[in-house]
Regions:
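Periplasmic-binding protein-like
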Residues: 57, 137-144, 218-258, 277-285
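Acidic, polar ligand-binding/catalytic clefts
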Residues: 93-156
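Extracytoplasmic small-molecule ligand-binding "clamshell" domains
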Residues: 33-115
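Bilobed "Venus flytrap"/periplasmic-binding protein-like clamshell domains
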Residues: 72-86, 119-120, 138-193, 208-215, ...
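Extended ligand-binding regions for polar small-molecule ligands
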Residues: 21, 77, 81, 85-86, ...
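Ligand-binding clefts/hinges and TM-proximal coupling segments of bilobed small-molecule sensing domains
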Residues: 28, 41-43, 172-185, 225-226, ...
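Bacterial lipoprotein signal-peptidase II cleavage site
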Residues: 17-30
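A ligand-binding cleft/hinge motif common to bilobed small-molecule-binding domains
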Residues: 103, 119-128, 177-178, 204-236
Length: 285
């Protein structure tokens, strides 16, 4: 069985939900961006009139481009600016700040309005932070070197004896743990270090979300291949959401913007532009 990267159409989920919703309060659905309680001048922003968005450094393709989130290139940069526009901000009103991935979802006050950084929505993280409605659904992928004995693997069971690694704090790391390999997962500070470990044959394979895996194989790891993809999110679809401070009064307005972008097809268009791949990747089970 194979499937393409565009496996889970979020817009369809939102449209079905909308179709099943009560028909009352239709005025809200046609409200202009940033109107009413979500008008820019009414928003509880970190800096009045300015939308502060966080992400990690470095910021990798295909989520961002040239490690510059402010250029609007890459899926997450484009999504961030689409959300900002939907909320009533001009591009010049957006300011970026750097926040390490594994500290973004820790409890406490945030110095940003929202963070966008392939952060999976989990019950555990929801205890410490808020999440928006999902803007992307992701599969995990296993990357090995072309000459690896695992390059011809066809099932997850084939990796029982493999040493696998992933970035600290990620769903990819939890996905490895779920495979119950003989060796404990190897943990790296970031994806770059994980890729270097694979290049140096210090690990049999690394796990990352599928779009990141495509980038790593194309640009970072010479002589590597994506063996396959698999779903893991504790039994639920893995979805990325914008992260906000716990109980942030901004959350409903961000949700309103993300939902609108899903329903009008913007998220699907951006996914097609920045994440679509012509190559099918086998599904590992």
């Amino acid at each position: 069985m194979k499937r393409t990267l565009l496996a889970v159409p979020l817009a369809l989920l939102f449209s079905v939900a909308a179709a099943c919703s009560p028909a009352e309060d239709t005025d809200d659905s046609t409200a202009a961006p940033g109107s009413g309680k979500c008008a820019v001048e009414e928003l509880p922003l970190k800096t009045p009139g300015q939308l502060t968005i966080a992400t990690d450094d470095p910021a990798f393709d295909p989520w961002f481009s040239d490690n510059d989130p402010s250029n609007g290139k890459g899926f997450e940069s484009a999504v961030a600016y689409a959300v900002a526009k939907q909320m009533g901000f001009d591009k010049d009103d957006v300011v970026w700040t750097k926040v390490p991935f594994n500290t973004s979802y820790q409890p406490g006050e945030k110095e940003f309005d929202f963070d966008i950084n392939q952060i999976s929505i989990t019950k555990e993280r929801r205890q410490a932070v808020d999440f928006s409605e999902p803007y992307y659904s992701a599969a995990q992928a296993i990357i090995v070197l072309d000459d690896s004995k695992f390059a011809d693997a066809t099932s997850l069971a084939d990796f029982k004896s493999a040493s696998l690694g992933a970035q600290i704090g990620t769903t990819s790391l939890k996905a490895i743990e779920s495979l119950e390999t003989e060796d404990a997962p190897l943990v790296y500070d970031d994806t770059t270090k994980a890729a270097l470990a694979l290049t140096n044959k210090q690990v049999d394979g690394i796990v990352a979300d599928l779009p990141t895996a495509f980038y790593l194989v194309a640009a970072e790891i010479e002589g590597a291949t994506i063996v396959g993809q698999f779903d893991y999110a504790g039994g639920e679809p893995e979805q990325f959401g914008l992260l906000l401070q716990k109980d942030s009064p901004l959350t409903p307005c961000v949700n309103e913007a993300v939902t609108a972008l899903a329903e009008n097809g913007t998220l699907a268009d951006l996914e097609q532009q920045w994440l679509a791949e012509s190559q099918d990747v086998p599904v590992l089970k």
